[in-house]
């Protein structure tokens, strides 16, 4: 599942990445075995680490297991641990931050969804 949007964040606290909203409902995937979040990202100056995660706007929580990070100045694909969504049709968006004042650049993302079927 491709996640829309891209953007950059120069903040040390979690900040929404513009236009990355999408809806996700586990019921839409019968036989769901697991989900991971893959993000193409980089850290503009390689100063510290850049982070991205998924945020469940509907329930006001970070999506468990969804955090990715890199210290690369070149765009790289990163992969989260297994991601756990709350039940129901939830509005999800990408958030980003860095541990320094460097800029985290999020280029694209996707959910890798594994089902039994």
Predicted regions and their residues:
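Extracellular jelly-roll beta-sandwich "head" domains, especially the C-terminal globular C1q domain
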Residues: 1-117
């Amino acid at each position: 599942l491709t996640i829309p949007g891209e953007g950059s964040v120069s903040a040390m606290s979690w900040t929404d990445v513009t236009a990355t909203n999408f809806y996700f409902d586990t019921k839409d995937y019968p036989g769901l075995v697991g989900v991971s979040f893959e993000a193409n990202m980089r850290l503009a100056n390689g100063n510290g680490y850049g982070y991205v995660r998924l945020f469940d706007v509907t329930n006001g929580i970070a999506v468990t297991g969804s955090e990715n990070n890199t210290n690369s100045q070149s765009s790289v694909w990163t992969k989260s641990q297994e991601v756990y969504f709350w039940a129901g049709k939830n509005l999800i968006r990408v958030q980003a931050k860095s541990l320094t004042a460097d800029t985290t650049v999020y280029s694209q993302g996707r959910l890798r969804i594994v089902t039994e079927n």
